[in-house]
């Protein structure tokens, strides 16, 4: 039995989330169908993180246990040949036998994009939240920094069963410029050991109150300390959010070299968001 790791990118617009659901189009469902078409095996493919309907990914990771004898390049090309246009394998790797895409992960990173221009750019309508106004980026940065470290994030998640911990460790945060289609956007980026359901979108929705002057930095900190969801802002729309990276301890995965991608003729440098071992 082999354990194969997959690096995924997808446009979440037309997926009902990443996790498999009966008779509903999901990322996991599309992957498992493509795997069966390629290998004639029915296997459960496990994703590192669950993304909601409309949320995108450029650095999602999955694993599958298999007896296929296909080499990694054949798996890569074959899966992409069977996958829909809004889901693609970016890299494949041979993982250690006990590797688990979810439980072996030590860090996950998300980016939320906001366009503050007077008029929206139609090409970005599925990946960027349009907000026609001025935001106080300095205040948003200061508020977001309050989340760094280990905290109880109960105020920034939906109702959670009492037995589940809402404590998470936020490793770093950033609010800054991001250019796309020659458009200057505002990016909110966060990295943590794990995230709660809707956590990033609730943080962004509350940060927007700070940016608009409807909540102070101190009040944002009070929301965190309160553990009360009712004090936080609205949940930001899903389409502005992208899972950009999942990171693992070194030595768990041997990824295919970028120079061996697909046709093997052009060396492609691997973007930093695709480096999944530290």
From Swiss-Prot:
Location of the active site: 52 (nucleophile)
One Pfam family recorded for the sequence: PseudoU_synth_1
GO process annotations (BP): tRNA pseudouridine synthesis
Subunit record text: Homodimer.
DNA damage among keywords: no
Catalytic activity: uridine(38/39/40) in tRNA = pseudouridine(38/39/40) in tRNA
Keywords assigned: Isomerase, tRNA processing
Region (Disordered): 259-278
Organism domain of life: Bacteria
Family membership: Belongs to the tRNA pseudouridine synthase TruA family.
Classification via HAMAP family: TruA
UniProt EC number: 5.4.99.12
Function: Formation of pseudouridine at positions 38, 39 and 40 in the anticodon stem and loop of transfer RNAs.
Amino acid composition bias (Polar residues), ranges on this chain: 261-278
Classification via InterPro entries: PsdUridine_synth_cat_dom_sf, PsdUridine_synth_TruA, PsdUridine_synth_TruA_a/b_dom, PsdUridine_synth_TruA_C, TruA/RsuA/RluB/E/F_N
GO MF term (any one): tRNA pseudouridine(38-40) synthase activity
Top EC category: isomerase
Protein name (record): tRNA pseudouridine synthase A
Binding residues for substrate: 110
């Amino acid at each position: 039995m082999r354990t194969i790791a997959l690096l995924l990118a997808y446009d979440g617009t037309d997926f009902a989330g990443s996790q498999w659901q009966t008779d509903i189009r999901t990322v996991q469902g599309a992957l498992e169908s493509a795997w069966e078409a390629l290998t004639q095996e029915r296997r459960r493919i496990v994703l590192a993180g669950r993304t909601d309907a409309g949320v995108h990914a450029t650095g999602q990771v999955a694993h599958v246990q298999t007896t296929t004898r296909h080499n990694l390049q054949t798996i890569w090309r074959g899966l992409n040949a069977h996958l829909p246009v809004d889901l693609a394998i970016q890299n494949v790797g041979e993982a250690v036998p006990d590797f688990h895409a979810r439980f072996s992960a030590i860090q996950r990173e998300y980016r939320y994009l906001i366009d503050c221009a007077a008029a929206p750019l139609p090409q970005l309508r599925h990946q960027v939240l349009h907000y026609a106004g001025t935001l106080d980026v300095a205040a948003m940065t200061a508020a977001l920094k309050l989340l760094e470290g280990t905290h109880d994030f109960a105020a920034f998640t939906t109702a959670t069963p009492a037995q589940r911990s809402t404590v998470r460790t936020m490793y770093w945060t950033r609010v800054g410029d991001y250019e796309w289609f020659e458009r200057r956007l505002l990016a909110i980026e966060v990295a943590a050991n794990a995230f709660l359901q809707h956590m990033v979108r609730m943080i962004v929705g509350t940060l927007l109150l700070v940016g608009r002057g409807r909540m102070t930095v101190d009040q944002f900190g009070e929301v965190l300390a309160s553990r009360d969801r009712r004090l936080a802002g609205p949940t930001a729309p899903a389409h502005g959010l992208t899972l950009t990276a999942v990171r693992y301890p070194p030595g768990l995965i041997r990824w295919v070299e970028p120079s061996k991608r697909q046709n093997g003729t052009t060396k492609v440098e691997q973007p930093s968001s695709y480096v999944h071992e530290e």
